[in-house]
Curated annotation (Swiss-Prot):
Its main location: plastid. InterPro entries: ATP_syn_F0_a_bact/chloroplast, ATP_synth_F0_asu, ATP_synth_F0_asu_AS, F0_ATP_A_sf. It comes from Cuscuta reflexa. It comes from the Eukaryota. Belongs to the ATPase A chain family. PANTHER family: ATP SYNTHASE SUBUNIT A, CHLOROPLASTIC (PTHR42823:SF3). The lineage of its organism: Eukaryota, Viridiplantae, Streptophyta, Embryophyta, Tracheophyta. This is ATP synthase subunit a, plastid. It is a multi-pass membrane protein. Key component of the proton channel; it plays a direct role in the translocation of protons across the membrane.
Length: 247
């Protein structure tokens, strides 16, 4: 009962995160739900950038690759290497998922620093990187959790759950809590880093608007890319762990 109670509290904590707010928000009413409209707008922009770039780069493949085709081939090779390293020989079906996570987070993070979101005025709140909202990072983390549970169950069936009593049943509560805390760490790490980066830039621009914020912005671009790599690498590692049965 204690384990079940802790698990329920952890899930409730993840649900309650959707109510966390930093600053003002532009709400849309969809049925009985209120959603953060500015997050949907910026997410659609990021998706449009990714789809548009991919379409332009690979719509007419060349034997001698163009710059765009070469870039996308390099990114694909990089994602395949990350997936193979973390998941193993059965990495193939998971490349699209890991690649989608990496590219969406990478472009979302960079959009917060490079796109002039502040030009567009909203009735309430302001536009920012999608990953600057806790709802986005929690959603990505929960997708990752669903993916590694699916990977483990599809590979081992119900025998997958035997890992919770290995190497000894005494560790059952710890093993269960470990799986429920993974999405917490993934979501808070990404959200905290992106929010902190944007807040630092805003504060420096307000204090010293000329030169000082520029190095910080370049550092933010670097850390934004690193955060995308960390998230996708951990997602691949969790999937590989569930398929191999490593604890």
């Amino acid at each position: 009962m204690d384990v079940l109670s802790c698990s329920i509290k952890t899930l409730k904590g993840l649900y309650d995160l959707s109510g966390v707010e930093v600053g003002q928000h532009f709400y849309w009413q969809i049925g009985d739900f209120l959603v953060h409209g500015q997050v949907l707008i910026t997410s659609w922009v990021v998706i449009a950038i990714l789809l548009g770039s991919a379409t332009v780069a690979v719509r007419n493949p060349q034997t001698i690759p163009t710059v765009g085709q070469n870039l996308f081939e390099y990114v694909l090779e990089f994602i395949r290497d990350v997936s193979k390293t973390q998941i193993g020989e059965e990495y193939g079906p998971w490349v699209p998922f890991i690649g989608t996570l990496f590219l969406f987070i990478f472009v979302s993070n960079w959009s917060g620093a490079l796109l002039p979101w502040k030009i567009l005025q909203l009735p309430h709140g302001e536009l920012a990187a999608p990953t600057n909202d806790i709802n986005t990072t929690v959603a990505l983390a929960l997708l990752t959790s669903a993916a590694y549970f699916y990977a483990g169950i599809s590979k081992k069936g119900l025998g997958y759950f035997s890992k919770y009593i290995k190497p000894t049943p005494i560790l059952l509560p710890i093993n269960i809590l470990e799986d429920f805390t993974k999405p917490l760490s993934l979501s808070f790490r990404l959200f905290g880093n992106i929010l902190a980066d944007e807040l630092v830039v805003v504060v420096l621009v307000s204090l010293v608007p000329s030169v000082v914020p520029i190095p910080v912005m370049f550092l933010g671009l670097f850390t934004s890319g690193i955060q995308a790599l960390i998230f996708s690498t951990l997602a691949a590692a969790y999937i590989g762990e569930s398929m191999e049965g490593h604890l």
